[in-house]
UniProtKB/Swiss-Prot annotation:
Record-linked InterPro entries: aa-tRNA-synth_I_cd-bd, aa-tRNA-synth_I_codon-bd_sub2, aa-tRNA-synth_I_CS, aa_tRNA-synth_I_cd-bd_sf, Glu-tRNA-ligase_bac/mito, Glu-tRNA-synth_I_codon-bd_sub1, Glu/Gln-tRNA-synth, Glu/Gln-tRNA-synth_Ib_cat-dom
DNA-binding recorded as keyword: no
Signal sequence, renumbered to the chain: none
Residue span of motif 'KMSKS' region: 250-254
Root EC class: ligase
Descriptive protein name: Glutamate--tRNA ligase
UniProt catalytic activity: tRNA(Glu) + L-glutamate + ATP = L-glutamyl-tRNA(Glu) + AMP + diphosphate
Cofactor stoichiometry and binding remark: Binds 1 zinc ion per subunit.
The keyword DNA-binding is annotated on this UniProt entry: no
Record's keyword terms, sorted: Aminoacyl-tRNA synthetase, ATP-binding, Cytoplasm, Ligase, Metal-binding, Nucleotide-binding, Protein biosynthesis, Zinc
GO BP, sorted A to Z: glutamyl-tRNA aminoacylation
Amino acid sequence: MTVRVRIAPSPTGNLHIGTARTAVFNWLFAHHHQGQFILRVEDTDRERSRAEYTENIKSGLAWLGLTWDEGPFFQTQRLDLYRQGIQTLLDKGFAYRCYCTPEELEQMREAQKAQNQAPRYDNRHRHLTEEQRQGLEAQGRKPVIRFIIDDDREIVWHDLIRGKMTWKGSDLGGDMVIARIADNPDQPFGQPLYNLAVVVDDMDMKITHVIRGEDHIANTAKQILLYEALGATVPEFAHTPLILNQEGRKLSKRDGVTSIDDFRKMGFLPQALANYMTLLGWTPPDSTQEIFTLTEAAQQFSLERVNKAGAKFDWDKLDWINSQYVHKMSGEELVDLLVPYWQEAGYPINIDSDRPWLEKMATLIGPSLTRLSDAAKESVLLFGGRVDYSEEAIAQMKQDGVKDVLQAVVEKIQESSQLTEDEAKDTIKQVTKTFKVKKGLVMRSLRAGLMGELHGPDLIQSWLLLHEKGWDKTRLTHGLSLVE
């Protein structure tokens, strides 16, 4: 048997972290078993579905490295297939036309509420005679299609994460609507609904394993009944834990960042985010291993090691994983990723003419980055001919003998248009010897004059970057003018 799984997002919003984590687990499972990963777009909600959300979902999955083997398939292009399934259920007596009005259904719910009963359809139109149906239609009523759910039925399945699952038919809310009222009088019924469309799709696409969030467990019970009624083999099911916020509630838009776009803009690398999502509910055989590619994770992945309990989203853990990936990247690899953040900060750069210089910048600040978005903050002292001086930097430059030291450095800079690392170190050595001061004083004073702060990235490498732009002389001269 070839393993076939699917991710089936609805394009009613941008790609959500929960959907993306489900996609990761499906992708890992498929690749572990040399199977196929299928993308299906469940776009039957025509009012809320948008083409731009579909593109966002596709680009988000691709950005994370979750390439699909088949698709994308769109449910709006498969309506005839669903109608065939509905007609089959009608012909076999597993479904019927229900003519209840919205007002009657509301009255039903209110009566149940008054008796402290859970709201459910009472199946009143399940056994209408042909004469009764004709009478209701003569009143101008249009039917929905309902699937019969036996209240006495016990639905049992073995969940690959949760073990034996049991659901009572009486807990499923009565006979289930599987098609809306027809918009077109030429059609026997209207828009097919979620549970019916999902089952028909999974049958047609020969899905062997349905891996999705635990919030779908009730749907699974309903869908098993539909598979059986349509004469199909029921796939295996696995219900993954929800992603929780730090308070233990389901992660939602109220928590702020939830879409993959949000994480991308915040400066997380796709491989780091995919790595983190892999661990968000799954424990590898070697529980000490935390850094791996999707391919490496797929080799070890099994549903048996997916947790049942909700997985708390840990920002510190994600930051740490992201930093591990960032710190392994060269300046050449980083530079194009950092440019947008420098540009957003308004730093004066030209990506074409400044590329070699920017690569050196990326090399310098790379080890201090946690997120790519930290680039603006970490390099703020390295852009421009002027810099704001902290009180500590001013105090450092006012120390006895420091002005002479810095002036000597300015003169050395003027003697040569080029500055190598060895020359920079030699200049510090010569000034230290000439003025008979400690090297530490020279280094602190030079940092204060060049950077405006007493702490920051490597001093020599920072100086070399500033010198390429001619900003070292400008800054030192300005700094000296402040302490005269």
